[in-house]
A protein has these predicted regions:
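Residue-level detection of the helix-turn-helix DNA-binding "recognition helix"
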Residues: 108, 186, 212, 216
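Residues in the recognition helix of alpha-helical DNA-binding motifs
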Residues: 87, 209-213, 228-230
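Catalytic cores of DNA base-excision repair glycosylases
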Residues: 2-176, 188-195, 199-205
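Hydrophobic residues on short alpha-helical segments
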Residues: 178-185
Length: 230
C-alpha cells in the first residue's frame, strides 16, 4: 500500500484491509469486487489485483507462509527488487540493502550535496557499509523517519537524484479517469457504458478507451452491453 501512496492515506485503509482479509487464505478467496471496494482511495489499483494473485501463490506454492528470501519474493506478482528487499528487512529483519525515497534522501543529503544526477548505483555501496547488520529493521525505520525530517528542514534532496521524476498532476489525468470509471463500475452490480458516460460527464472517447484498458488488465468484464467487476 505504501508504494507511491502517503502514510496518512494508508493507515485507515490498512486497518480495514487487514480486518477484512486477516490472512492469505481469506484474501485469495475474496472477490475482486470486495478487495477493490476497500482499496478505493489508495490509487494504483493494479496493486490490489497483485495482492490477490500473491495470496493465491503463497497458498498454492508456499503452504500459506510468505517466503522470507528477497530472491523468492521478487518472483511474486507486482513485487520488484525494492519491495522484495523491504519485506525481507521489515518483516523478517534481514540485512538486505535497498533504496526507497527517504533512504535516498538521507544519503544524497550527506554525501552528494555538491552533485546532481546522483545514481542509485553510487548510493548502494554506502548504504551497504552503513547498514546495521544486527538490527536492520530498526535501522531502516530510523533512516526513513530521518529522511522525512530532512525534507521538512532542508527541502527535497532527491531532486539531485538521476532517477528523480516530478509526479504529474493527478487532477485531469488518465489515472484519475481510471479511478473514476472503476469506482462507477464498483457502485452497481452491472452498469452500461452510456450510464458511465452520463454520470462522469467526461469525453466519451476517453471513457471508452479506459473501459477497454480496464477490461484488458483484468479489472472489469463486459457482458453484452454492461460492465461489472471481473
Amino acid at each position: 500500500m505504501l508504494q507511491q501512496t502517503q502514510v496518512e492515506r494508508v493507515i485507515e485503509k490498512y486497518q480495514r484491509f487487514i480486518s477484512a482479509f486477516p490472512d492469505f487464505s481469506s484474501l485469495s478467496q475474496a472477490s475482486l469486487h470486495d478487495i477493490l471496494s476497500i482499496w478505493q482511495g489508495l490509487g494504483y489499483n493494479r496493486r490490489a489485483i497483485a495482492l490477490k494473485q500473491i495470496a493465491h501463490e503463497v497458498i498454492t506454492k508456499y503452504d500459506g507462509i510468505l517466503p522470507f528470501s528477497a530472491d523468492i519474493l521478487i518472483q511474486l506478482p507486482g513485487i520488484g527488487k525494492a519491495t522484495a528487499s523491504a519485506i525481507a528487512a521489515f518483516a523478517f529483519n534481514q540485512p538486505v540493502v535497498f533504496i526507497e525515497t527517504n533512504v535516498r534522501r538521507v544519503f544524497i543529503h550527506f554525501f552528494f550535496q555538491d552533485r546532481d544526477n546522483v545514481k542509485d548505483s553510487e548510493l548502494l555501496p554506502l548504504i551497504e557499509r552503513a547498514l546495521d547488520q544486527d538490527n536492520p529493521r530498526q535501522w531502516y525505520y530510523a533512516l526513513m523517519d530521518y529522511g522525512v525530517m530532512l525534507k521538512k528542514e532542508f527541502g527535497n534532496a532527491n531532486r539531485k537524484s538521476f532517477h528523480y521524476q516530478r509526479q504529474a498532476p493527478f487532477q485531469g489525468s488518465q489515472r484519475q479517469l481510471r479511478g473514476l470509471v472503476l469506482k462507477t463500475v464498483l457502485q452497481a452490480p452491472k452498469v452500461t457504458e452510456t450510464t458511465i458516460i452520463k454520470k462522469l460527464k467526461k469525453e466519451p472517447k476517453k471513457i471508452k478507451e479506459t473501459l477497454k484498458q480496464l477490461q484488458m488488465e483484468g479489472f472489469i468484464r463486459k457482458e453484452r452491453n454492461t460492465y461489472s467487476i471481473a
